[in-house]
A protein has these predicted regions:
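Core subunits and conserved enzymes of cellular information-processing
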Residues: 1-200
Length: 200
């Protein structure tokens, strides 16, 4: 769902999709840095601003690599437009693996892509982070809904209506956040115990 925003903009203005995604991701990183800086001054216990900002900035090289691969592979992925069962199966697998991957990288504080990083930043800097990992899943759902709404508005205002939106986008909007929430509920304490020797 996050990628639907740069996709719709790139189609409307005729700009390269991967480059538009990079621009949107850099905007996300800037927002993350602002959120973490404000959080530092509001919550005095949040005393690792330098580490948070470093993780935020390092998302830009990750974005550059990701969007270059997006350019390379977007034309190489085979189409399954005429095979609905295969489409549904691939969608379900993609939603589950995306949710698990996002949860694991965010929980372990590995440098995420900015789409996940901004969700983590919102969760970190709000009361949602008190919900034992469930806040990230809820934030993901809210952020995905916001992006789908923005995409819908872009399409509607430019006469393209459902540009960048489909059944897969809607199911991913709901599913990825729920997978993160379920995964964190089942495994977050175990991961924290193994990696950081603490349990929330």
């Amino acid at each position: 769902p996050i990628i639907s925003v740069p996709y719709s903009i790139s189609n409307v203005i005729g700009f390269n999709f991967a480059n538009m995604t990079l621009i949107v991701y850099v905007v996300f990183v800037i927002i993350e840095m602002i959120l973490h800086t404000i959080w530092q001054f509001v919550d005095k216990s949040a005393n690792q601003l330098g580490m948070y900002l470093l993780r935020d900035v390092l998302q830009i090289p990750v974005s550059i690599i990701f969007t270059r691969f997006l350019n390379i592979f977007s034309g190489m992925i085979p189409s399954v437009n005429n095979n609905m069962p295969v489409q549904i199966m691939l969608l379900i697998i993609a939603v589950i693996l995306t949710g698990i991957g996002a949860a694991m990288s965010l929980n372990m504080r590995i440098i995420p892509n900015p789409g996940d990083g901004i969700v983590q930043a919102i969760s970190d800097t709000t009361k949602l982070n008190k919900r034992k990992g469930k806040g990230v899943g809820f934030c993901k759902n809210c952020f995905d809904i916001t992006n789908v709404t923005i995409t819908f508005i872009i399409g509607l205002s430019t006469g393209h209506f459902l540009l960048g939106l489909g059944v897969g986008t809607i199911l991913a909007m709901i599913g990825v956040g729920r997978v993160i929430a379920v995964f964190n509920n089942l495994f977050m304490d175990k991961m924290n115990k193994i990696a950081f020797d603490y349990v929330e």
